[in-house]
Regions:
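N-terminal lobe/hinge region of extracytoplasmic solute-binding protein
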Residues: 37-87, 118, 188
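Surface-exposed binding/hinge segments that line
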Residues: 95, 129-176, 181-201
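Periplasmic binding protein-like
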Residues: 105, 389-445
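Structural transition elements
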Residues: 193, 325-361, 375-382
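Ligand-site clamp/hinge motif
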Residues: 216-268, 397
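Periplasmic-binding protein-like
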Residues: 294, 298-337, 382-383, 488-498
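Extracytoplasmic/peripheral linker and loop segments enriched in polar/acidic and small residues
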Residues: 399-413, 438-508
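Long beta-strand-rich cores associated with HINT superfamily self-processing modules
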Residues: 506-526
Length: 526
């Protein structure tokens, strides 16, 4: 069976990756401290347990990957030195490169890799699809392991090198033995930076130091691939939840790099000659309204359909983003922009009266709908406010509960009723890497309690997603994507509230920033 094209797997990343060709670092100053303001507070250290981007970015600081996606959408070896694929693409062999060492001093072995893949495959949505196709996966010696498939799965290399939500980060086997439903509390990787646990102050600061034992590939950095060179001795993540304070700190030179700036600050920062404002992901992000399928009222399809018809993307974008330069309404669950799986099939038009009728048909009993509101994250806080007003316009009672982003990320894992600490709705966003195809889109999964937070159950959705992965003919893949979208707009696993771009900013003394669909802090000097 021929391997599925990377274009099919990560099609939406084309525009992102095409601009990510940062030059190879040459005469840059080395050493010093990079002072970085992340988009949220880091509270969860396990990038397999959660898909939260703050934890993914932490993962890229300290972990490494077997394979990686470069700026040209090519999967390249990273920890792997060489690999082979049988002619029928049913057998794979991977050999690690020399010099790989975990931060605790132990060597990285094939056993660690197999254990990490197994844990990731029990949690990640693409990993689950791959795991379902496995016959066996075993270490051959300390540096080599093999994967044998039971049924065809053309995305093995792409899955092992997926760049986001969740990348396959390699950790020691003793940590990878942790049940994927439980968090790993110890942050031990083999990547270019080490996590300094003693200096971690949740709600304030995260510290990383250069890993002197890390041996980068002798290649130019390219996307998430190539040589990962730590050019600073220390990276400090400084959590500043108040945008005005972060803005003042950046302009005063007290910080170097602000990951996600609120759009109303962009015009001022663009005029500052000492700063550069840039769009972190030119393809944009998809806004996501996620209902809890386990608890009333959204365990009823009619209530979820009420949400779908009540959401007017233009109104959300005007309220959340404001500047049309940075947003557009998009009817496709696979995002818009001339992409292979972009389609308007099945997309309804907003209809508030129909939404009211559907909510009434759902037998909604008037209990308050708990909407989690992360007030420190503009791209989740603002849509929460809009949704609260939309629900009230439908005649629903709303309990808008304020919290920070990291608290919301932890709480959304709770399956209990809202009265016992659970929830009904949360808002987030996903970059192109994470929603562009039926395989990578975690919000589409219908795997029940093994699905992404919100836990929709749909055997038909899982059947179609598995069929999409096995299909090799592009026209048939497009047709399957349309079937999946039609089904999703009927079952409503989530509601898209628009497509938008998120800018970041850094001082011009900062060099080597990689523009990619994930925040990467190697290659940077100050």
């Amino acid at each position: 069976m021929p391997q599925l094209s990377r274009r099919a797997f990560l099609a939406g990343s084309v525009a992102v990756a095409a601009t990510a060709r940062a030059p190879f670092v040459h005469a840059q100053k080395r050493g010093g401290t990079l002072r970085f303001v992340p988009h949220a507070d880091l509270k969860i250290l396990d990038p397999i347990w959660t898909t939260a981007y703050i934890t993914r970015n932490h993962g890229y600081m300290i972990f490494d990957t077997l394979l990686a996606l470069d700026a040209d959408l090519k999967i390249r070896p990273q920890m792997v030195d060489k690999y082979t694929v049988s002619k029928d693409a049913m057998k794979y062999s991977f050999t690690l490169r020399d010099g790989l060492k975990f931060h605790d001093g132990t060597p990285v072995t094939a056993e660690d890799c197999v254990a990490s893949i197994k844990r990731w495959g029990g949690r990640d949505q693409v990993g689950r699809l791959m795991t379902a196709s496995l016959n066996k996966m075993v270490p051959v010696d300390r540096k080599t392991f093999t994967i044998d498939l039971e049924t065809p799965f053309g995305l093995v290399l792409d899955a092992l090198g997926k760049p986001s939500a969740s990348p396959l980060f390699i950790m020691p086997a003793r940590l990878a033995a942790t049940d994927p439903s439980e968090q790993v509390k110890e942050a031990v990787g083999s990547g270019p930076f080490k996590f300094v646990k003693d200096e971690w102050q949740p709600g304030n600061r995260v510290v990383y130091v250069k890993n002197p034992d890390y041996v980068p590939r002798n290649e130019k950095p390219s996307g998430a691939a190539g040589g990962k060179r730590a050019l600073v001795d220390r990276v400090e993540w400084r959590y500043i939840p108040d945008p005005a304070t972060a803005n003042a700190a950046l302009e005063a030179g007290e910080i170097d790099y602000w990951e996600n700036i609120p759009l109303d600050f962009a015009p001022r920062l663009e005029k500052n000659p000492d700063l550069r404002v840039f769009v972190t992901d030119p393809r944009g992000s998809q806004g996501i309204l996620r209902p809890n399928h386990l608890q009333p009222p959204f365990n009823n399809k009619a209530a979820r359909q009420a949400l779908l018809y009540a959401v007017d993307q233009q109104k959300y974008m005007q309220a959340v983003i404001g500047n049309p330069k940075y947003y557009k309404a998009c009817p496709s669950l696979f995002m818009c922009g001339g992409l292979p799986y972009e389609t308007a099939v099945g997309a309804p038009k907003p209809d508030l009266e129909r939404a009211k009728r559907l909510l009434k048909e759902s037998a909604y009993d008037g209990r308050p709908i708990v909407v989690m509101d992360p007030t420190d994250t503009p791209y989740a806080h603002a849509p929460a406010l809009v949704t609260a007003e939309v629900l009230r316009s439908l005649g629903a009672a709303v309990d808008l509960q304020a919290m920070d982003w990291s608290t919301m990320v932890q709480r959304r894992a709770k399956k209990e009723p809202p009265a016992q600490g659970g929830w009904n709705i949360f808002h987030t966003w996903a970059t192109a890497f994470d929603v562009m195809t039926p395989a990578v889109s975690a919000p589409l999964s219908g795997a029940g309690e093994k699905a992404w937070f919100g836990w929709p159950t749909s055997e038909e959705m899982e059947r179609l997603r598995a069929q999409w992965v096995r299909e090799t003919v592009e026209d048939k893949r497009r047709a399957l994507a349309e079937q999946i979208q039609r089904l999703a707009f009927d079952e409503v696993p989530f509601v898209p509230w628009g497509q938008f771009e998120v800018p970041g900013a850094f001082r011009k003394t900062v060099r080597g920033v990689l523009q990619f669909g994930a925040t990467l802090l190697w290659n940077i000097s100050v």
